Amino acid sequence: MKITAVIPIRSGSQRVKDKNLRAFADTNLMELKIKNLLQVPELTSIVVNTNSELAIEIVNKSYRGGVTTHRREEYYASSQCSGSEFFRHLGEVTDTDLFVYCPCTSPFIKPETVSQCINQFISTSDYDCLATVSSV
C-alpha cells in the first residue's frame, strides 16, 4: 500500500504571509514538518503541494529524492477554493492509495502519533478518514 504524506504550503496566506517558511527557532515550519515525517516508517512518500516558488526551491535543494513537490494551480491556493474542492483536488493529483494530510501549522505532532494514526486507520475498514484532536 502506498501511503503519502501531503504537506500543503500556500504562498498567499491571508493573515501571516509565508507563515510556513518564516524562521521558527533554527528552522521553519515546513522543514520541521518534513523532518518529523521522514521519521515515520509507514510513509512511502512525502509531497509538498504548493504554489510557492520558495518552498519548491527549499525542497529541491535540501531534500533531493526524499521529498517531492507538486506545483499547485493558483485556483487551489486561492480563497475562492473551498476546503472540499481542495481535498478532492489533492486526491486527484496525489498518486497514492492513502494520503495523510499534514499541515505545517500543527508542528508538534510527533512522528509516533502519525504512525499510530496510520496503523489505526489501516487496521479497520469502518472509516474513510481520521483526524487528530486535543482536549482543551
What do the PLM-derived regions correspond to, one by one?
Residues E31-D95:
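Conserved N-terminal catalytic core of the sugar/cofactor nucleotidyltransferase
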Residues I9, T50, A131-V133:
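Short beta-strand/turn micro-motifs composed of small residues
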Residues C102:
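Catalytic metal- and UDP-sugar-binding loop of GT-A-like glycosyltransferases, i.e.
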Residues S79, E85-F86, L98, S106-V136:
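Conserved core of the sugar-phosphate nucleotidyltransferase
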Residues M1-K17:
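N-terminal nucleotide-binding beta1-loop-alpha1 segment
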Residues A5, I46-V48, C129:
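Hydrophobic/aromatic residues located in beta-strands of well-ordered beta-sheets
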Residues V16-Q39:
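Short, well-formed alpha-helical segments that are part of the catalytic scaffolds
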